[in-house]
A protein has these predicted regions:
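Chalcogenol-based redox active-site neighborhoods
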Residues: 1-153
Length: 153
């Protein structure tokens, strides 16, 4: 697993969001983007993380960020997740793992003594020029917005 680092340029990609809209790296051009990767929609940690970002969405926008969530869930699962919790940001349905592998967040994990491949919960702050400004690899699901915003002051 070779995860993108600060200073790297984001890879080219094309996927769809929970509404079926096409999203590419070009949609990020000229914006500061928070791209958060989570293992699975509608699971406790992922729900806590996304709801915290939802609850602090206005603050994140005021700081100049556009938010996008990414998992390997289907468009339908992402839509159900977004609708259930009223998320104001797009959730990318990366079933082909193009974005996930491009950012280097797919790899071996351990849970309850078992090893398997999966998505590592990580967040990338992307500068307007498409380079990685910051990588958060120790995501605190219940206070993730604060982790992002604390670097602004």
């Amino acid at each position: 697993m070779k995860t993108l680092q600060v200073g790297d340029t984001i890879p080219a990609f094309e996927t769809t969001d929970h509404l079926g809209q096409s999203v590419t790296q070009d949609d990020f051009h000229g914006k500061r983007v928070v791209l958060f990767f989570y293992p699975k929609a509608n699971t406790p940690g992922c729900t806590a993380e996304a709801c915290d970002l939802r609850d602090h969405y206005a603050e994140l926008q005021a700081a100049g960020y556009s938010l996008y969530g990414v998992s390997a869930d289907s468009e339908k699962k992402q839509k159900n997740f977004a609708d259930k919790y009223d998320f104001p940001f797009p959730l990318l349905a990366d079933e082909s793992k193009t974005v996930i592998e491009g950012f280097g967040v797919w790899g071996p994990k351990k849970f309850m003594g078992k090893e398997y491949d999966g998505i590592h919960r990580m967040t990338f702050v992307i500068a307007a020029d498409g380079t990685i400004e910051r990588v958060i690899d120790k995501v605190k699901t219940k206070t993730h917005a604060a982790q992002i915003l604390d670097q602004e002051s």
